[in-house]
Amino acid sequence: MKKALIKDTFREIKNSFGRFISIFGIVLVGVAFFTGVKSSARYMKYSADTYFDNNNLFDLKMYSNVGFDDADIEKLGKTEGIDRIEGVTSIDVITNVHDNDETVQIFSYDFSSDDNLNKITLTEGRFPENPGECVIRDYGIAREPIELGTELAIKDDNLKSTSYKVVGKVSTPYYLSYQYDTTTVGSGKISDVLFISEDEFTGDRYTVLFATVKGAKDEYCYGDTYFDIVTPVKEKVIENADDLSEKYAMLGGYTFYALDRNSHYSFVDYKNCGDRMDAIAKVFPAFFYLVAALVCLTTMTRMVDEQRGGIGTLKALGYNKISIAGKYITYALLASLAGGVLGCVLGLLTFPRIIFNAWNVVYTVADFTEVPQISMCVLAIMIAVLINVLATFASCFSMLTETPALLLRPKSPKNGKKVLLEHIPFIWKHFNFTKKVTARNILRYKKRFFMTITGIAGCTALILAGFGIKNSISKVTSDQYGTIFAYDIAGEFSEASDKDSFYDEYKENKNIKDIYIMTSHMGTAKKSESEDTTKNVTIVSVDDGKRYSGFTGLTYHTSKETAVIPEDGALVTYKLAKDFNLKENDNRSEEHT
């Protein structure tokens, strides 16, 4: 008897292949979208982890106000847990790029070695071979490129040459995007990064030390285990640096900082991008699973209704409820499994690569790294199968409780009854016959009605969300440069200037309506003294908060009322307050860079 029922199940799949494909298709789309988008965050982070490991990105970086010499490096390198330590000289200078004065950051680099920490990779041209040559970080398509052969005039007492010729372009794990460290030179924003030979610097002290930690490379760098290894070593380095304070006591004070990757902007910024993709995967795929349940419920309900007589025959022949329900559950199970497996394959092969390449317009993570996603695939398929099996069981449960005699007879139509509109004669009498039948059927088949409403509402919500995202993004520009930035022209002083004399010079210009001068500098904000989490911030100082509001519109996040910078205290952005859990009257310190 069981063989006959199994044969009948596969015959049913063949005879109603269109229905089978409808369940198969919606499960495929739902699972593909879920696994593809959900795994994108994991792929992005693991690709970055591989890129960092292959190019020896630092685990710890160390700064001091007096720099470091070889003896300092040797002492700190003996700290328990330190694997490698290297000293690098770095300065920020101003040069002319594309007819604009821009601030560039210059790092020393040992081009004779192919295993440096923060190893750079040549993407175009060659490495420097002669004095006065440099390589520049390659932006890809993120900005206007600096061509090979460009001479950059750079005058600084720390450099032996006064100009540097760009002979190559490189990528570096130290910077993944066009967002660099802050600086006190020029505008406070670094525009380009150059690498020159160590011999090009006149001094013999290093400005920063980079170190790797034993065993850290074996761990996933965005996981807790990685930081469980790095953090104790960082604390030991800080303890070991106490001896250096005695060495440099005669200089009037010694300041030492040891920072891990959580204090490095590029590392944290890329993690945040992956987290955003993960957040999207928690919302949108839910709709596809809901639609899959509705499609399965509708399809199987209709199939069960059509085979009412067949179910009665099976019950009359002695098949129990479980065996009969198993036929339809197997039908939905096979469609869900097939769609789920193929959806996982297609989702993992398409979405992660598309999303990774899209983000790589901004970030320079070299290669896409594939990571096993078995648990995620199993979860996605199990959810789809469970939803469809439950929907199938719900569709046939009520019919299986009836006796064979009732099932073998045609199903009695539902009792007719008046709908609400029939009680409103001046509306109902204007309906023709077709409209009256439609109105009655809407309330007669409530399940189908609500499933249709839910499906249409979900599709409309997705379309509306797409247009909403598009409009929100396009509105950012008009809000930013129409409402927030009310000024037409912004300029920067190359050096400190007398405000009053500047006003006197330009107040007679009829083309200028008003001028306001403020002071701003870059800095870092710390969540607390006990934590290393920092954020780059712009600190603005004004002498007249009301006048400043006429040039830059500030509003409170909740009330949307106009905000004015107070004479005593400070205003912070909503995002900074949220990230650091700040409340009114809180005190926080910031450090100038």
Please tell me what each predicted stretch does:
Residues 8, 12-18, 294-334:
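Interfacial "coupling" helices/loops that link adjacent transmembrane helices in transporter permeases
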Residues 293, 297-302, 309, 333-365, ...:
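Small-residue-rich transmembrane alpha-helices
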Residues 73-88, 318, 505-521:
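Short acidic amphipathic segments
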Residues 3, 400-419:
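Short cytosolic juxtamembrane segments of multi-pass membrane proteins
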Residues 29-36, 288-296, 338, 342-346, ...:
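Hydrophobic alpha-helical membrane-associated segments
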Residues 2-293, 302, 321, 361, ...:
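Membrane transport/envelope proteins' first extracytoplasmic loop
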Residues 1-32, 329, 333, 417-458:
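N-terminal Sec/SRP start-transfer signal
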Residues 62, 433-566, 574:
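Juxtamembrane segments of multi-pass membrane proteins
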